[in-house]
């Protein structure tokens, strides 16, 4: 049964990649491309470029837009003609890569919480969701928030439950919080319930230690 689900999951994922890389640009992708461009210019000029404010982009920190644009510039250096003629392909390649990594994170997290069967099924159901599938290549906001949320939850869970690699898990937890905030400033609101549950778990886990500390 697992082999059948994995085969189907792989097929749907390949279909998602093909769809993402062949579909054209959506209406708001131009905004995110320009948002990445002006912030990239600001970085490479060490703050001398001051034309980075346009429309309502003050509500979009632009970390992912800048990263996506920077990766595109690497391809531009390698093959200028290809980049100029396939800018939609390049942007969607970055987006679908992050979307696929979010599915991997969902699989790993669900496997930790439940088992392999449920992890495969959860990943497949997520991929089959038309809102997720259809946005894998062209959405530079919501699926990146999902990516940040899933990997934050995964490493925060490891930090709370495992006694090994505590520093590594804490650093990666913090990294994905920062990454999510770099996409949307409201990201802490999304992860707040998870953090509260984690703190309660940690308190109960080390409750005896706290009591001994207070007794001293």
What is each model feature region?
Residues 15-18, 30-66, 70-80:
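Extracytosolic helix-loop segments that constitute the early lumenal/periplasmic catalytic or substrate-binding loops
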Residues 186-201:
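Transmembrane-embedded, aromatic-rich helix segments that form part
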Residues 67-97, 116, 131:
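Juxtamembrane segments of multi-pass membrane glycosylation machinery
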Residues 10, 93-113, 151, 155:
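Transmembrane-helix motifs of polytopic, lipid-linked glycan transferases
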Residues 1, 152-170, 202-205:
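Membrane-interface transmembrane helices that cradle and orient dolichyl/undecaprenyl
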Residues 122-127, 134, 154, 177, ...:
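Short helix- or helix-capping micro-motifs
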Residues 26-27, 131, 137-145:
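Short acidic/glycine- and proline-prone juxtamembrane loop motifs at membrane-interface regions
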Residues 2-29, 180, 201:
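Transmembrane signal-anchor helices characteristic of membrane glycosylation enzymes that use polyprenol
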């Amino acid at each position: 049964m697992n082999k059948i689900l994995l085969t189907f999951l792989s097929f749907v994922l390949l279909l998602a990649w093909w769809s993402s890389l062949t579909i054209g640009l959506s209406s708001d992708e131009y905004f995110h491309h320009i948002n990445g461009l002006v912030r990239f210019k600001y970085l490479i000029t060490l703050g001398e470029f001051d034309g980075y404010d346009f429309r309502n982009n003050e509500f979009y920190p632009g970390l992912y837009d800048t990263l996506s644009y920077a990766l595109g510039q690497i391809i531009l250096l390698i093959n200028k003609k290809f980049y100029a003629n396939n800018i939609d392909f390049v942007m969607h390649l970055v987006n679908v890569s992050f979307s696929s990594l979010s599915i991997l994170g969902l699989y790993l997290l669900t496997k930790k919480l439940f088992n392999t069967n449920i992890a495969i099924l959860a990943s497949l159901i997520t991929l089959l969701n038309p809102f997720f599938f259809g946005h894998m290549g062209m959405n530079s906001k919501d699926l990146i928030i999902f990516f940040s949320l899933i990997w934050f939850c995964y490493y925060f869970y490891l930090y709370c439950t495992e006694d090994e690699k505590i520093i590594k898990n804490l650093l990666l937890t913090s990294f994905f919080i920062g990454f999510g905030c770099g996409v949307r400033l409201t990201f802490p609101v999304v992860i707040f319930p998870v953090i509260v549950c984690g703190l309660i778990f940690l308190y109960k886990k080390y409750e005896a230690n706290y009591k001994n500390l207070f007794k001293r």
